[in-house]
Swiss-Prot record:
Family as reported in the entry's similarity comment: Belongs to the TOM1 family.
Annotated ranges, domain GAT: 180-268
Gene name in the database record: TOL9
Keywords: Cytoplasm, Membrane, Protein transport, Transport
Cellular component, GO annotation: cytoplasm; membrane
Function summary: Might contribute to the loading of the ESCRT machinery.
Protein name (database record): TOM1-like protein 9
Length: 675
């Protein structure tokens, strides 16, 4: 039976030690020590097995019975040759785990059983034999169980206690342990904080060197309560699993430790401790925010320079306050300010001009709808009427050479190109010969003497809208992405006629001839009369001036001859509408009747350079299909007109150039695709 139990405890089928069977064997040996001989004999047999697992399980069982059983087992282990068998196995170089287990057991036993003069010297003899064989004993763990089990002081729990021996005199004294404290609750933590604050206030009010006040009953009681709470907090930290309660307990423990340390320092007579009691808490808050300067820029330079000298009451709040909203300065050097109500400025397209203001009370612009789909915007924003100057300088060339380019202000509409209906302000191509300015809603009131094209004595004073835009021409902006730069020697001719405004909406003054908004299409500048918006049809000659209207599509493709008859009929209606206005404004025309055409006929009469070389510089091209502005020509060049196919009217182009051959009374159908 005993051998069967040992066989089951050391079976090779086990994954690990069968502790239930091992303890059962120990109980059997403790109850019947006579069974120890058979058990030790069976274990010795299993130790000599060739299976390393069986050897390890047998060694584990041997260790268990040596530690848990009495002197009878120790004697049989020493006398039955178990130690000698273990030394022999080590010398045979067995499995590593088996060898290490044997070395640990022999080293432990030789120390426990007392050396060569002990009761059982076999343990020490086996240890010395292994040392002579060169075995290296591993270091023992200090947490290993002792070889001898301490004597039993209480009856086993598995057996019922002896009720007859029960009495007050037979009670076994319990070992002294740490006193149990009830777990701290949130309310008790708050109470402890209040007691700690009262003690801290009393300590801070003490005079330096006065130890008599420390003996007051109230202070002694507070110190005692703080020490008790500190012990309870330590117990709470070691036992609780609530994270929030643990966090508050740790914070309370730090505060209690600080206050008790200050109390002990005052009691020991250390100088300068009573005045430093409340400082650590406030300095801790400051150090988290302000080390060398404020972590958050509040916009106050004094706080940044002297961040450490701020008041203790508002120091932390000032550091944690959100920064004030930045103050926008529209007149500094901002490129665009479309949202502020005080400074309404448009983006200067060219390079920055330090000498010219961008946005001020005298230089305010009205915001217009930059993305309107129709040029005849029913409700454009207008500038205040009381402001005399309403244009910003957008032309660096005109600003740098105001005398030589006085005629540049009239370049709008001078070559017969105007914004196409249906495109926004940014999509409308601004050709090099001029486009009506969309940025001014009222004519300016500052007359300047410009140099007109003919420079004859019959020239009238400049119109008010040209006087303001003389030096600043948006269409001649060299850096504009929408219009190429203009040649410095260009001149154009303007008309000093008022705008014929028949619709209820305010008109946009143009640097060229005024605009008549009777039709949705713009007409070319005509001698002595206002100009309507674009019309994609050619104009009827009036007063000897041939005014061809050139739409955007004429630049990219030839005009269709089959539509000329219908267009001439429509132009006849326009001619009748303009006849009245022509008679009223006939006396205001310039000396040269061809000045409004914009091709430089007046310069040709003056003997100047060829008009094409001067007027075609920087002329940009726009294709109706792609809606993209072509790159400007960098040098003065002659751009030949795009000739439509199969047009018999090409022979009339000589009449346009030669003024002497021009017949004002006979209408001629001009080219629609000329530049």
């Amino acid at each position: 039976m005993v051998n069967a139990m040992v066989e089951r405890a050391t079976s090779e089928m086990l994954i690990g030690p069968d502790w239930a069977m091992n303890l059962e064997i120990c109980d059997m040996l403790n109850s019947d020590p006579a069974q120890a001989k058979d058990v030790v004999k069976g274990i010795k047999k299993r130790i000599g097995s060739r299976n390393p697992k069986a050897q390890l399980l047998a060694l584990t069982l041997l260790e268990t019975i040596v530690k848990n059983c009495g002197d009878m087992v120790h004697m049989h282990v020493a006398e039955k040759g178990v130690i000698h068998e273990m030394v022999r196995i080590v010398k045979k170089k067995p499995d590593f785990h088996v060898k290490e287990k044997i070395l640990v057991l022999i080293d432990t036993w030789q120390e426990a059983f007392g050396g060569p003069r002990a009761r059982y010297p076999q343990y020490y003899a086996g240890y010395q034999e292994l040392l002579r064989a060169g075995a290296v004993f591993p270091q023992r763990s200090e947490r290993s169980a002792p070889v001898f089990t301490p004597p039993q002081t209480q009856p086993l729990t598995s057996y019922p206690p002896n009720l007859r021996n029960a009495g007050p005199g037979n009670d076994v004294p319990e070992p002294s342990a740490e006193p149990e404290f009830p777990t701290l609750s949130l309310s008790e933590i708050q109470n402890a904080k209040g007691i700690m604050d009262v003690l801290a206030e009393m300590l801070s009010a003490l005079e330096p060197g006065n130890k008599e006040d420390l003996k007051q009953e109230v202070m002694v009681d507070l110190v005692e309560q703080c020490r008790t709470y500190k012990q309870r907090v330590v117990h709470l930290v070691n036992s609780t699993s609530d994270e929030s309660l643990l966090c508050q307990g740790l914070a309370l423990n730090d505060d209690l430790q600080r206050v008790l340390t200050n109390y002990e320092a005052i009691a020991s007579g250390l100088p300068g401790t009573s005045s430093q009691i409340e400082k650590p808490k406030s300095e801790t808050g400051k150090s988290l925010v302000d080390v060398d300067g404020p972590l958050i820029d509040t916009g106050d330079s004094s706080n940044q320079a002297n961040g450490a000298t701020s008041s203790s009451g508002n120091g932390v709040l000032n550091q944690l306050a959100l920064p004030a909203p930045p103050v926008t300065n529209g007149s500094a050097n901002s490129k665009i300010d479309l949202l502020s109500g005080d400074d309404l400025a448009l983006v200067p397209v060219g390079p920055p001009q330090p000498a010219s203001p961008v946005a001020s009370d005298q230089n305010a612009l009205a915001l217009i709808d930059m993305f309107s789909d129709n040029t005849n915007n029913p409700s454009p924003a207008t500038a205040p009427s009381g402001n005399p100057a309403q244009n910003i300088p957008l032309n660096p060339q005109g600003h740098q050479q105001p005398n030589s380019q006085a005629g540049e202000a009239g370049l709008q509409q001078s070559n017969g190109f105007a914004p196409q209906v249906g495109y926004s302000q940014f999509e409308q191509p601004s050709y090099g010969q001029g486009v009506s300015s969309p940025w001014s809603s009222q004519p300016a009131q500052q007359p300047v003497q410009p140099s007109y094209g003919a420079q004859d004595s019959t020239a009238f004073p400049p119109p008010p809208w040209e006087a303001q835009l003389q030096d600043y021409s948006p269409s001649a902006e060299s850096g504009s992405p929408f219009s190429p730069g203009m040649h410095p020697t260009q001149t154009a001719f303007t008309h000093a006629q008022p705008v014929n405004n028949n619709n209820p909406y305010p008109q946009i003054p143009q640097t060229g001839p005024p605009v008549n908004n009777n039709s949705p299409y713009a007409q070319m500048p005509q001698t002595g009369q206002a100009v309507a918006n674009i019309s994609p049809y050619p104009q009827i000659p009036q007063n000897g001036v041939y005014m061809p209207n050139q739409p955007n599509q004429a630049l990219g493709s030839g005009y269709q001859p089959q539509q000329q008859q219908q267009q001439q009929m429509m132009m006849a209606q326009y001619y009748a509408q303009q006849q009245q206005l022509q008679q009223q404004q006939q006396q205001q025309a310039y000396g040269n009747q061809m000045g409004g055409y914009g091709y430089g006929y007046n310069q040709q009469q003056q003997g100047s350079s060829p008009y094409l070389d001067q007027q075609m510089y920087g002329l940009s091209m726009r294709d109706q299909t792609s809606h993209q502005v072509a790159s400007s020509s960098s040098t003065t060049s002659y751009l030949p007109p795009m000739k439509p196919k199969n047009k018999p009217e090409d022979k009339l182009f000589g009449d346009l150039v030669d003024i002497s051959k021009f017949k004002p009374t006979k209408p001629t159908s001009g080219r629609a695709g000329t530049m």
